[in-house]
Every structure is written in structure tokens, then in C-alpha cells.
A protein has these predicted regions:
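Loop/turn positions that initiate beta-strands
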Residues: 31, 92-97, 189-192
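Extended acidic/polar, glycine-enriched regions
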Residues: 44, 89-120
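A short mid-domain helix/strand-loop element embedded in enzyme catalytic domains
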Residues: 114-142, 164-165
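Active-site nucleophilic cysteine motif
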Residues: 134, 146-165
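...with weaker cross-activation on analogous glycine-rich loops/strands in unrelated enzymes
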Residues: 167-226
Length: 248
């Protein structure tokens, strides 16, 4: 039997241990593929098919039959009910959906669940304008382990660029640091440079500024590159470990 499953709710926390008081290490979003390593009545231990991330989620809200045809390319896509009225639920950026039927403005993704047609792209679409994606998350609150509009951490905002484009990239900063190819250390930064510290990462949006999910500011924010490097060194005694760049 094939061990391939897909998450079918907007999002869920992934826990380090099978307990809601355990550390939240990441999240799983709608349409994300995973394998089940073990399970009991309440919990399943999963391994993400995208990045091999391992953790625990509640033993519910998943299926083995899901063939994604499109994906969400806005920060959050409001879900409409069968009467075409808005609900309080949203699909997060990069959710992978199957289209059941289409009308003039909406697409049905599950029976009685619709989202706006203009909010999706085909599953094989490659988004090259990574700055527009990064800026979707501006002012999103910082949450350790988060990777959606409800909250996001520094490594997730970088990984989502690759996840959307169906390209492998690790989840945690320590693994991203090892995986990323190093550029020559320099003081002249450019758009697309990725700056790594121990436990933190930021992306340059031009020669002078960067964007990152920054814990001390509790949100995704644009800051001066040089100021950020100075603040991090002064407050944490951490220096830049590697400069890489975004490569699709």
C-alpha cells in the first residue's frame, strides 16, 4: 500500500512530541504531502514528502486521494461555503488544491468549499518575482514554527519561496545554512542575497535593505542590512556565517 497522504485543512501545527504542550516545530498546510511513520488513536508521526521534516500532528483531517492541479498565490484565500458566502476560514499561501468545478469568479476545491479563481495558479507555475512573495508577509507576526499568514518564522519565509515553486529547500535555518551554496564574503550586497547567522536568516531586497521575520520586532519587517548586522552582533554576539543567494 502506498504511504502517501495529504493534509485537508487550512493548517495545523507540527509538534516535536505527540502532545499539544510540546514544542511547535513547524506547520503543515492544505494539500501538503506526507508519509505516516507511526500512529495511535489521537496522533500520527509524519514525514513531509517535500523536505523530510518529521513531527506529530493530530490523527485527523487527511486523505490519501488528492491530485493537486493548482496552488494559492496570495497570502490567504478566503473560503466560501456552498451558498457562496464568505466563511471565517482561509487557505494559506502555497496551499495545493484540486479543482472540482469552476464558475465565473469562484472555483470549488471540495464539496461546498469555494475560493476565488483569481487567487490560484496552475500547480507547475514558477513564480520568479520572489520580492512580491516576500512582501506578502510584511507585518505578519513572528511565531516560532509558523509558516502562514497567522504567523511565520525566519526560515519558513525563505522555504516557502521554494515550496511554492516545487523546489526542495530545508525547513530549519541550520539545515538551510548547510544546504545553501556560499557566495564570496563581501560588504556589497545585492537583491536576492541570503544572509545567514546561527539560528537566523534574512533576504536582501536591494543593496541596502533586507526582509526577515524578526523575533525582537515580533513581525516580518524590512530593515537596513548594515543596521541589522550591527544589532544582531551587539545584542547576541552573532556574526554573519554565510552569504548565499536565491536560486530556483
Amino acid at each position: 500500500m502506498k504511504n502517501n497522504f495529504f493534509y485537508k485543512k487550512p493548517l495545523s501545527n507540527i509538534y516535536k512530541k505527540p502532545s499539544e504542550v510540546s514544542e511547535v516545530t513547524s506547520q503543515i498546510i492544505y494539500g501538503e504531502k506526507f508519509k505516516i511513520l507511526s500512529k495511535n488513536k489521537n496522533w500520527i508521526k509524519i514525514k513531509s514528502s517535500f523536505d523530510n521534516y518529521i513531527g506529530y500532528i493530530k490523527n485527523k483531517n487527511y486523505t490519501d486521494s488528492h491530485k493537486p492541479t493548482h496552488k494559492v498565490f496570495v497570502l490567504k484565500a478566503n473560503i466560501f461555503n456552498k451558498t457562496k458566502n464568505k466563511t471565517k476560514y482561509f487557505l494559506p499561501y502555497a496551499s495545493k488544491i484540486s479543482i472540482i468545478q469552476v464558475n465565473k469568479k469562484l472555483i470549488e476545491i471540495e464539496k461546498g468549499k469555494w475560493i476565488k479563481k483569481k487567487y490560484v495558479k496552475k500547480i507547475n507555475h514558477i513564480e520568479k518575482d520572489y520580492l512580491s512573495v516576500l512582501k506578502l508577509f510584511l507585518k505578519t507576526k513572528y511565531i516560532w514554527g509558523g509558516k502562514t499568514y497567522k504567523g511565520i518564522d525566519c526560515s519558513a519565509i525563505l522555504q516557502l519561496l521554494y515550496y511554492y515553486n516545487n523546489k526542495f529547500y530545508p525547513r530549519d535555518t541550520k539545515d538551510q545554512l548547510r544546504f545553501s551554496k556560499s557566495s564570496v564574503k563581501r560588504k556589497n550586497y545585492k537583491k536576492g542575497d541570503v544572509i545567514f547567522w546561527k539560528g537566523h536568516v534574512a533576504i536582501c531586497i536591494d543593496a541596502k535593505n533586507l526582509i526577515h521575520a524578526y523575533g525582537p520586532e515580533k513581525k516580518v519587517i524590512i530593515m537596513s542590512i548594515n543596521k541589522t548586522i550591527e544589532i544582531i552582533e551587539r545584542t547576541t554576539r552573532l556574526i554573519v556565517k554565510k552569504i548565499s543567494s536565491i536560486r530556483y
